[in-house]
């Protein structure tokens, strides 16, 4: 066993990867009679307790007509409940020694909170109040709509954000993953309070909710309190899965001519969902290409050729079709050469296997980052709810670690040849062509 692997496994043990007898090894999962899924993880390592309430509501269930409605709803749920004003919600969270927030994403929406462990009951009551009894004041809806429209316009003025939004649109086509989570301006202009209320009533139902709690807590007491707090949560009718257009890989190149001190070059490829058997191997592939300062793009394009200021690559986890993308920022004068160099590395990793040293580095970096990201109860509860929402279930974190450890040089070459054959390229800069 090489020293890098020993170091990675030592870090894993130190940071509490499951399977090593840690008190936080596995959450207890229970589905309440109304359909709410509860995951409780006892972790005595810190005095802070955290909870994440996930709702299966997000861009995946939206259309062009209501694109952005989930994000808008999540911005307004904290603006008041039947028993608390927006200020009282914020003050209650602060008095618990923590905070509360809400957001939306492609496959889920979340209400999250943290508190000192002794205040866990009030923390859960606050989450339930916000989730089940928001008032969604008209003035707040209007204000958050304006703020979201401003944010969308701002993204058009940010070169990287504009290039990334364009890449996702070109990779996914008409699939909802191709739209910004913030939505579309035309759709947002049509969304009023009545539509937000209807959206909340449709999606904030017990069978669509996942509540994960992590901290110095007693599982039995938490389960009983959650059952009490969510006893009146609506249960039906069920919301069916959306009929989504197929995302089909296609070679494509988009040029955006835009004044910018730094040119952007991005390449994207359709990739498998998180539940796919190739998930771990594609994660390693993406890390070998763009993860950290020893990755291919950093060493070959930035260090050796001097053609980039920044490089990167990622493969975000999705319930539906994923995307593997690579990115670099460069001087406008080097844009064409930088694009050719990046595409050359993407082609090379399809033709030539990575070395055993590259494989070990990529796996070590990937697993080390994963361990570091799971050090706090806030992140542990988020991951527990996230993996449940993506339908890969309890224990996925441990299965994922084992799957990454098992990835071989041959696996990386195979998935590179499978998924990197049809690049979608976006290039942005003052002299882009």
Model-identified regions with their sequence ranges:
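Mature N-terminal segment immediately following signal peptide/propeptide cleavage
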Residues: 25-54
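Charge-rich, well-structured scaffold segments of protease-associated domains
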Residues: 31, 88-238, 255, 273, ...
């Amino acid at each position: 066993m090489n020293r890098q692997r020993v170091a990675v496994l030592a870090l894993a043990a130190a940071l509490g990867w499951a399977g090593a007898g840690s008190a936080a090894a596995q959450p207890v999962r229970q589905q309440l009679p109304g359909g709410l899924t509860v995951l409780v993880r006892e972790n005595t390592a810190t005095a802070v307790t955290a909870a994440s309430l996930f709702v299966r509501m997000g861009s995946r269930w939206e259309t062009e007509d209501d694109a952005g409605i989930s994000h808008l709803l999540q911005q307004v749920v904290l603006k008041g409940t039947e028993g608390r004003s927006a200020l009282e919600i914020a003050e209650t969270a602060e008095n618990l020694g923590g905070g509360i927030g809400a957001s939306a994403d492609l496959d889920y929406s979340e209400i999250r909170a943290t508190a000192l462990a002794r205040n866990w009951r009030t923390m859960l009551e606050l989450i339930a109040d916000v989730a089940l009894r928001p008032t969604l004041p008209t003035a707040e809806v209007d204000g958050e709509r304006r703020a979201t429209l401003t944010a969308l316009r701002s993204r058009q003025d940010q070169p990287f954000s504009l290039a990334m939004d364009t890449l996702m649109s070109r990779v996914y086509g008409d699939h909802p993953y191709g739209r910004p989570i913030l939505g579309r301006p035309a759709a947002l202009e049509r969304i009023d309070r009545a539509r937000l209320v209807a959206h909340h009533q449709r999606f904030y139902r017990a069978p669509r909710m996942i509540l994960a709690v992590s901290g110095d807590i007693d599982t039995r007491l938490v389960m009983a309190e959650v059952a009490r707090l969510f006893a009146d949560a609506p249960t039906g009718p069920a919301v069916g899965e959306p009929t989504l257009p197929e995302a089909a890989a296609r070679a494509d190149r988009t040029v955006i001519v835009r004044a910018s001190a730094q040119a952007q070059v991005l390449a994207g490829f359709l990739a498998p969902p998180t539940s796919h058997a190739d998930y771990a191997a594609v994660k390693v592939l993406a890390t070998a290409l763009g993860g950290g300062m020893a990755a291919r793009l950093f060493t070959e394009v930035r260090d050796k050729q001097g053609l980039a200021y920044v490089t990167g690559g990622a493969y975000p986890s999705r319930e539906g079709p994923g995307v593997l993308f690579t990115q670099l920022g460069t001087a406008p004068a080097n844009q064409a050469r930088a694009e050719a160099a990046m595409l050359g590395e993407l082609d090379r990793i399809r033709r030539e296997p990575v070395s055993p040293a590259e494989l070990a580095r990529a796996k070590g970096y990937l697993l080390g980052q994963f361990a570091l990201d799971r050090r706090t109860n806030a992140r542990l509860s988020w991951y527990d709810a996230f993996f449940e929402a993506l339908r890969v279930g309890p224990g996925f974190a441990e299965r994922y670690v084992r799957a990454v450890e098992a990835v071989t040089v041959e696996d990386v070459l195979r998935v590179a040849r499978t998924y990197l054959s049809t690049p979608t390229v976006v290039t942005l800069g003052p002299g882009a062509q």
